[in-house]
Amino acid sequence: MRKIIVGTRKSNLALTQTEWVIDQLKKAGVKNEFEIKKIVTKGDQILDVTLSKVGGKGLFVKEIEKAMFDKEIDLAVHSMKDMPAVIPEGLTISSIPEREDHRDAYLAKDNILLQDLPEGAIVGTSSLRRGAQILAERPDLTIKWIRGNIETRIRKLQEEDYDAIILAVSGLKRVGLSEELITEYLEPEVCVPAVGQGALAIESREDDEELTNIVKKIHDAYTAKTVSAERTFLHLLEGGCQVPIGGYAYLDGDEVVLTALVGDPDGTTILKETVRGTEPTEVGKEAAELLISQGAKEIVDRVKEEMDQ
């Protein structure tokens, strides 16, 4: 029986997610032996600038995908929100397990609510999407970029001049940090999450049928359907996770309901639409067309241009 080598980033969160996937596969009856191989990605190496300035798609996946092409690893576990809208030829997202919490978490010193933060208070985030939506809600706040893993960011909130930070709820839960740290859960009505937030992507070589059949055991149809709508929208706007784009879908009966967002980083323009329909890719396409007709493409292109300077 073959040994399966799983590639992942070396952060605590990435390792925890990978161990969770292996655990789920074993619970599903997979008897193979697994080995985890830690891989350093470009996004992990560059910590002194904002992610959006680093630019490029696949900041956290390219090196891992190369290891897969080179057959150093058999499969990879990624955060879905790190996945570019287009997967390299020869590779495929072979399984999408059940999604963890999709929401953003707002953590504040002294648990001060977002609406009660004083004027000029500093909110830490490395995401233009989060920054744009916070500024749309509270233009009097100051957004300051913050990098590092979850534990580092929480420490920075406690020790540095941040009044609050925004993190993904799923990340906090996965690394086992107490949800008591969370001051407020930001529902999609307040802050539309990143496309695929809370979901994982298991990526493998397209021609490896044996492995595809193994990882399909933990594939979740509900998550796959909703993520498909979100990622279709992302693909049509040609946005990576470093652009102020958000998308969250859920199922209502047999309909997919997608809320899609594109915003100016300063929060002055927020384009947001909710679309529903039975076919996930059609829903994603309709949302993209609606926002493009309102000027979303111009915002995305302008942000990309500013990043390249």
From Swiss-Prot:
Q: Which residues carry this modification: S-(dipyrrolylmethanemethyl)cysteine?
A: 241
The answer to keyword Transferase applying to this record is yes
Kind of enzyme, top EC level? Answer: transferase
List the pathway annotation.
Porphyrin-containing compound metabolism; protoporphyrin-IX biosynthesis; coproporphyrinogen-III from 5-aminolevulinate: step 2/4
What does the cofactor field's note say?
A: Binds 1 dipyrromethane group covalently.
Q: Pfam families of this UniProt entry? A: Porphobil_deam, Porphobil_deamC
Q: Which superkingdom, per the lineage?
A: Bacteria
UniProt-listed Enzyme Commission number(s): 2.5.1.61
A single GO cellular-component term on record? cytoplasm
Please name the InterPro entries in this protein's record: HemC, Porphobilin_deaminase_cofac_BS, Porphobilin_deaminase_N, Porphobilinogen_deaminase_C, Porphobilinogen_deaminase_C_sf
Q: Name one GO molecular function term.
A: hydroxymethylbilane synthase activity
One GO biological process term is: protoporphyrinogen IX biosynthetic process
Which keywords, in A-to-Z order, does the entry hold? Porphyrin biosynthesis, Transferase
Q: Which cofactor names does the annotation list? A: dipyrromethane
Extract the PROSITE patterns matched here.
PORPHOBILINOGEN_DEAM
Tell me what reaction this enzyme catalyses.
4 porphobilinogen + H2O = hydroxymethylbilane + 4 NH4(+)
> What does the record give as the function of this protein?
Tetrapolymerization of the monopyrrole PBG into the hydroxymethylbilane pre-uroporphyrinogen in several discrete steps.
Subunit structure and binding partners = Monomer.
HAMAP family hit by this protein: Porphobil_deam
Similarity field: Belongs to the HMBS family.
PANTHER family attached to this UniProt entry: PORPHOBILINOGEN DEAMINASE
What else does UniProt say about it? The porphobilinogen subunits are added to the dipyrromethane group.
- What is the protein name for this chain? Porphobilinogen deaminase
- Say which species the protein is native to: Oceanobacillus iheyensis (strain DSM 14371 / CIP 107618 / JCM 11309 / KCTC 3954 / HTE831)
